[in-house]
Amino acid sequence: MNHPLKLPGSQTVAQPRIAAVTPQWPSYTGTSQLVGTSPVGQVTVYVDPSLGAPALQNAQDLLNDADRVVSANNAIFGTSGGPVSVIVFALGGATDGTGGADHLGCDYTTGNAIEVCASFGSSNRVSALFEAELSECSMGGNLCGQSTGEALSRWCASQISNNALPDFATAPQWAQDGQPDYVDQTDPTDQNADSTGCGMAFLSWLMSKGYTLTQIAPAMVAIGSGGTFAQLYANLTSDSASNAWPAFQSAIQALPNGVTSDDPFGTGPQSGS
């Protein structure tokens, strides 16, 4: 999320080794230690060996979890992605996941080399960060770099990890800043907490109305980078796009505790997605 989720039981993984040929990472320039390739063969995991055993554990856990994440991501978008490589290291110098994640593009060609921040002792956060970038690859060049796509990628990460990144929440800041309208307009950046937060709260609201990410994600990709959340609302509900913001605002105002998380309507993880 620099361009800024539970793990299965432990499994036997390949012994780490230095890769002969490594991907071109967005920013990492150190040694890439190969940990292995997932059983399905779609995800190859590397680690920065200088971080020692805690980072290696993160990488091994990600390797064990990778196929589950890919399968969940494919189900959300209704498509199958391509092979990706991912490296676990201290992105931004952090080892608690707060360094986020990054990749160079929003498809499986330009964005298939993914960086994720190590999170010592909390490998579910590493899986969440991986899904945040993987979901952007599944957007196929649409939405990525926009407030709409950033909100969608964060919701995907939350769904596959049971909200392992609550400290990345932006909806409370959006509420504190006066709830600017990013439903009728899309912000052409993924770095604005207000526009991302508006999107997080809006998607929470849509899901509280019964729409799942498996419906929302393909609909957003179809609308594309020039689309708005109001258009998404219209396409899903068959109501007028002009009613999206007023209806959303009414729902926000009716919240008994206000906006205190990225999921103010309490939709939580969805088994259907």
Model-predicted regions and their roles:
Residues 1-134, 138-145, 156, 243-245:
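Zn2+-dependent metallopeptidase catalytic core
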Residues 69, 142-193:
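Post-HExxH zinc-binding segment in Zn-dependent metallohydrolases
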Residues 80-83, 124, 161-169, 209-217:
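Structural helix-adjacent loops and short alpha-helical linkers that scaffold large soluble proteins
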Residues 93-100, 160-166, 226-231:
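Secretory-pathway/luminal and periplasmic proteins that interact with or process carbohydrate-rich
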Residues 94-100, 180-191, 267-270:
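Surface-exposed intrinsically disordered loops and tails
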Residues 156, 196-249:
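Extracytoplasmic, non-cytosolic globular domains
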